[in-house]
From Swiss-Prot:
Record lineage: Bacteria, Bacillati, Bacillota, Clostridia, Lachnospirales
Gene that encodes it: rplR
Protein name per the record: Large ribosomal subunit protein uL18
Subunit structure of this chain's protein: Part of the 50S ribosomal subunit; part of the 5S rRNA/L5/L18/L25 subcomplex. Contacts the 5S and 23S rRNAs.
Annotated transmembrane regions: none
Xref: NCBIfam families: L18_bact (TIGR00060)
Function field: This is one of the proteins that bind and probably mediate the attachment of the 5S RNA into the large ribosomal subunit, where it forms part of the central protuberance.
Family as reported in the entry's similarity comment: Belongs to the universal ribosomal protein uL18 family.
GO CC terms, sorted: cytosolic large ribosomal subunit
Amino acid sequence: MVSKKSRTVVREQKHRRLRNRFSGTAERPRLAVFRSNNHMYAQIIDDTVGKTLVSASTLDKEVKAELEKTNNVEAAAAVGTVVAKRALEKGIKTVVYDRGGFIYAGKIKALAEAAREAGLEF
């Protein structure tokens, strides 16, 4: 009997494969996105030194104050806007988008488009 892998296991395998293909540098850091059932998280990471330069999530007071729910497309867009604004304040203009093995649709796409509209290039 062949058992089917869970969605989480498949997503983690995809993410590992993607991470082998690219990494963030000081000139072009990585915008890593994680989606849980209740929240969205985004970090801009310099992989050469292993440090998070900028982060934002639906748990931040700045983001949470303007949201009714934290697990919808509007919340993801708000996180994208905030992470882009914080990155531009630190002088980060271009990033590599790491969708974390998630399908590029819905909340993942909304976060990316909001970050682009706010001024990040990827």
